[in-house]
Amino acid sequence: MLQPKRTKFRKQMKGRNRGLALRGSKVSFGDFGLKATGRGRITARQIEAARRAMTRHVKRGGKIWIRVFPDKPITAKPLEVRMGSGKGGVEYWVAQIRPGKVLYEMDGVSEELAREAFALAAAKLPVTTTFVKRSVM
């Protein structure tokens, strides 16, 4: 699963996830993309589950790019532990998703196959998504 090799600090504060995705909002590698229309947090496990679903559907047909990376640590205290005595340990990693962010891209397959594969991937993700094509300028 995806996670940073090393970070400057082990733990982060919760923060707020506001605004729109300024970077990573255009399809830049493949021909088709899966774009987030809602906001939320996607865990490394969810990113991997969606990738597997797409890869299995397209078989050896196309190339898939993952455009998000889980770089925010989420901590949790063990069960039945009293409050206090510091922040819990890092449990998992998430990517914060804003509306407009392209999550995955695909190339080398037909549009119909790409739509089907992205529909399978979208079912694994906690944010609402839409299918987008590369815009030719």
Curated annotation (Swiss-Prot):
Q: Which CDD domains match?
A: Ribosomal_L16_L10e
Gene Ontology CC entries for this record: cytosolic large ribosomal subunit
Q: What is an example of a GO molecular function annotated in this UniProt entry?
A: rRNA binding
Q: Enumerate the UniProt keywords alphabetically.
A: Ribonucleoprotein, Ribosomal protein, RNA-binding, rRNA-binding, tRNA-binding
The protein's matches in SUPFAM superfamilies, at most eight in alphabetical order, are given as: Ribosomal protein L16p/L10e (SSF54686)
Gene Ontology biological process terms from the UniProt entry: translation
Statement: the UniProt record of this protein carries the keyword Phosphoprotein? no
List membrane-spanning regions: none
Superkingdom of the organism of origin:
Bacteria
- Which PANTHER family does the UniProt record give? 50S/60S RIBOSOMAL PROTEIN L16 (PTHR12220), LARGE RIBOSOMAL SUBUNIT PROTEIN UL16M (PTHR12220:SF13)
Name the job this protein performs: Binds 23S rRNA and is also seen to make contacts with the A and possibly P site tRNAs.
Q: Please report which protein family the annotation says this sequence is part of.
A: Belongs to the universal ribosomal protein uL16 family.
Assembly, per entry? Part of the 50S ribosomal subunit.
Return the protein name: Large ribosomal subunit protein uL16
Organism name: Cellvibrio japonicus (strain Ueda107)
Query: What gene is this protein translated from?
Result: rplP
